[in-house]
């Protein structure tokens, strides 16, 4: 059955329009409460990123959950993976995150975690949708839920993050630039890195509700790249607005994406004998990653785009690492969802164990030039059904043979058509291939 409200990563949209309104959010909280109340604890944890609309949506969710008889547990600004982790440690029935991740402040979203810290199954999402369409009826007054706040949630999560970094290593003597995107990691990531011994230069740690992801963080790496070089830092680490993505910068200012970080983690696990099976990427992962891993003898498989699909393939194969090139990296031996801080620490651990700089570790992977074009399109004409678009893509695929790839897909969260072309050619040539397909799209 097709979902009516939930997208690929919860419910997301522009605040005040679509579904991101106080009215709908209250109804969503009630509907989710009705479904979740059927099992286990009545506690539901709520975390959010610092964008201004989060306060409004948090209040609406709190009211809806309480009306269904559940106890909302408020944690304030908290990274998405922290909510996943704390949902398990508090034995809550679910966790809810109010965030639009890497999107601008005027968007927001709501996503859920199960009591095991995993994304809700599509079956549960469909159950919640069925309840949304019913009339809201409060439980009896004696059964109403009562909200309370956890004051030490950040401290608990900081200790968890540090526990994933081998105790035999420290960051003494290292200068590290940390960019928190004015998002949910602003009060956590700098402390994690500094408590491990590094001299931290913090950026993006002054959220005002409107500046989340604004020219900073994992989706805008120019500022941290320049800062690392200016400060003569050893490396930089950047997160997105909700803290589930990570990108890194070596001492030269070069930006390492999720593909390169996955390679470094996989290689380190292979060397230490802790690699279980292989590594999972997505259809967007660079062909160079696949070939570099195979050179090491590490199996590699691709899932559909989205961390949910990455995790599903990891579970199917019984593998412990997977990533998207956007910086969602899952290390399931630590947590069952993408965690920017924890994943970054695994890369830093690889630096420590190999006694190599980030610059040296990235030399093992040769990436092909990859061009990604994002196009708005006319909703009346599906580009994936447009014969002109498909014919041009097929022509280029035939031309490239096994030396490159073409991938066409629509975004699951916004009306955007994505064209990806990569090949063992110059960037100029690859861009030309992508543009020739884009020229066929009716916008």
Swiss-Prot record:
**Which GO terms are recorded in the biological process aspect for this UniProt protein?**
carbohydrate metabolic process; peptidoglycan biosynthetic process; UDP-N-acetylglucosamine biosynthetic process
- Offer a single GO CC term for the protein: cytosol
Annotated keywords? Isomerase, Magnesium, Metal-binding, Phosphoprotein
Provide the record's note on post-translational modification.
Activated by phosphorylation.
Q: What class of enzyme is it?
A: isomerase
Reactions this protein catalyses:
alpha-D-glucosamine 1-phosphate = D-glucosamine 6-phosphate
Q: Which residues carry this modification: Phosphoserine?
A: 101
One GO MF term on file is: phosphomannomutase activity
Under the heading CDD domains, the entry gives: GlmM (cd05802)
**InterPro entries from the entry?**
A-D-PHexomutase_a/b/a-I, A-D-PHexomutase_a/b/a-I/II/III, A-D-PHexomutase_a/b/a-II, A-D-PHexomutase_a/b/a-III, A-D-PHexomutase_C, A-D-PHexomutase_C_sf, A-D-PHexomutase_CS, Alpha-D-phosphohexomutase_SF
Q: How is the cofactor bound?
A: Binds 1 Mg(2+) ion per subunit.
Q: Which residues are listed for Mg(2+) binding in this entry?
A: 101, 240, 242, 244
Q: What family name appears in the similarity comment? A: Belongs to the phosphohexose mutase family.
Q: What is this protein called?
A: Phosphoglucosamine mutase
What organism does the record attribute this protein to?
Psychromonas ingrahamii (strain DSM 17664 / CCUG 51855 / 37)
The root-end lineage is: Bacteria, Pseudomonadati, Pseudomonadota, Gammaproteobacteria, Alteromonadales
């Amino acid at each position: 059955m097709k979902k009516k409200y939930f997208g690929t990563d919860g419910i997301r949209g522009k605040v005040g329009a679509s579904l991101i309104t106080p009215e709908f959010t209250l109804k969503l909280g009630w509907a989710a409460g009705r479904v979740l109340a059927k099992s286990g604890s009545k506690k539901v944890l709520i975390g959010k990123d610092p964008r201004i609309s989060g306060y409004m949506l948090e209040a609406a969710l709190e009211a809806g959950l309480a009306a269904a008889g559940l106890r909302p547990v408020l944690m304030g600004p908290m990274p998405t993976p922290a909510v996943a982790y704390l949902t398990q440690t508090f034995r809550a029935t679910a966790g809810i995150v109010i965030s639009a991740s890497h999107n601008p402040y005027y968007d927001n979203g709501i996503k859920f975690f199960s009591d095991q810290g995993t994304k809700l199954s599509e079956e549960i999402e469909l159950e919640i949708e069925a309840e949304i369409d019913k009339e809201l009826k409060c439980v009896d007054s004696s059964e109403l839920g009562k909200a309370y706040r956890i004051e030490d949630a950040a401290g608990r999560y900081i200790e968890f993050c540090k526990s994933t970094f081998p105790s035999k290593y420290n960051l003494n003597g290292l200068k590290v630039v940390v960019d928190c995107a004015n998002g949910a990691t602003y009060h956590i990531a700098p402390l994690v890195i500094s408590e491990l011994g590094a001299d931290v230069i913090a950026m993006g740690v002054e959220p005002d509700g409107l500046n989340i992801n604004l020219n900073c963080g994992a989706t805008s790496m120019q500022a941290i790249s320049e800062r690392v070089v200016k400060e003569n830092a050893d490396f930089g680490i950047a997160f997105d607005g909700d803290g589930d993505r990570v990108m890194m910068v070596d001492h030269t200012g070069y930006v390492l994406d999720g593909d390169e970080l996955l390679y470094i983690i996989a290689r380190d696990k292979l060397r230490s004998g802790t690699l279980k099976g292989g590594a999972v990427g997505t259809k967007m992962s660079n062909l160079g990653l696949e070939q570099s891993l195979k050179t090491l003898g590490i199996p590699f498989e691709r899932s559909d785009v989205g961390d949910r699909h990455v995790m599903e393939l990891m579970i199917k194969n019984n593998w412990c690492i997977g990533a998207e090139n956007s910086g969602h990296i899952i290390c399931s031996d630590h947590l069952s969802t993408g965690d920017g801080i924890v994943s970054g620490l695994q890369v830093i651990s690889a630096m420590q164990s190999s006694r190599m700089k980030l610059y040296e570790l990235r030399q093992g992977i040769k990436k092909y030039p990859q061009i990604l074009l994002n196009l708005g399109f006319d909703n009346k004409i599906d580009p994936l059904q447009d014969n002109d678009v498909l014919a041009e893509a097929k022509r280029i695929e035939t031309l490239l043979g096994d030396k490159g790839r073409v991938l066409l897909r629509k975004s699951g969260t916004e009306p955007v058509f994505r064209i990806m072309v990569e090949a063992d050619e110059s960037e100029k040539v690859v861009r030309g291939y992508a543009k020739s397909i884009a020229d066929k799209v009716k916008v």
